[in-house]
UniProtKB/Swiss-Prot annotation:
NCBIfam families on file: MalateDH-SF1, PRK05442.1
Residues annotated as binding NAD(+): G12, A13, A14, G15, Q16, I17, G18, N106, Q113, V130, G131, N132
Protein name in the entry: Malate dehydrogenase
Annotated catalytic residues: H188
Catalytic activity: (S)-malate + NAD(+) = oxaloacetate + NADH + H(+)
GO function terms (MF aspect): L-malate dehydrogenase (NAD+) activity
GO biological process, one term: tricarboxylic acid cycle
Encoding gene, per UniProt annotation: mdh
Amino acid sequence: MSSTPVNVTVTGAAGQIGYALLFRIASGQLLGADTPVRLRLLEIPQAVRAAEGTALELEDSAFPLLAGVDVFDDAKRAFEGTNVALLVGARPRTKGMERGDLLSANGGIFKPQGEAINSGAAEDIRVLVVGNPANTNALIAQTHAPDVPAERFTAMTRLDHNRAIAQLAKKLGVPSAEIRKITIWGNHSATQYPDIFHAQVGGRSGAEAVGDQKWIAEEFIPRVAKRGAEIIEVRGASSAASAASAAIDHVYTWVNGTPEGDWTSAAIPSDGSYGVPEGLISSFPVTAAGGKFEIVQGLELDAFSREKIDASVRELAEEREAVRALGLI
């Protein structure tokens, strides 16, 4: 076991996702069963007391890997010496709110957090943005951390990836473990493109195994893209445990690598691959090794896939222009 704890900062720590996330981190599921962690919980002042209550519960769980818990309402202090940052807290869209208002409100959160990460985080900092709009929030934070390599900022599409695996497995009547090489392209929004044309199921492509293009276009893609809204409708609250689980998966894969013969999905700064403008934080098929994500290259895209990817990338470019116009990047 490593003797030096890894500092993990979680923002929005008193929220539902934070509550579902923190106990799994403390149990070793984020980084591995031999890596101790010190948790740093960041909240807005009015939620600090609730976060302190969660800290008490974490202490009471007596996790062998938990080296300590600290609660902050100041970003500079919360990110000091941090190795892994999970940016969960964000301003949700409320009824009647325009997209510009949403982006502006979140800019007020992610700009100072990016600055705090830039000034105080550890040299090996890795950042995962969970709070929506995740891709553009990640872009805002990354822009304000110019001394941190851009590749250290990612946004979460692993929840969409996991949802796509689950839907395909359900359709084919196979365990989720048999599904490999699913891809989520583009934005973590309703325009995302869940791609099963390169997926593998028992030696066949996902699309070939399904054998029903109408189901793919009219049921599978919309069901995955709009699953969050479906859960709100059924549960009466947004998905929290599944989002926390996906965040765990994302960071664990980033640190420990993807299995041989498989890849995952993550929103990372584009290097121009697949025609996605450089610098946009877009979801790609990625492998992880040595603590770095790499975009899977050389995948052939048919006209259907190209159109879907381009539509989502257009939305990302529009969001980038909107935050640029607001002076946030």
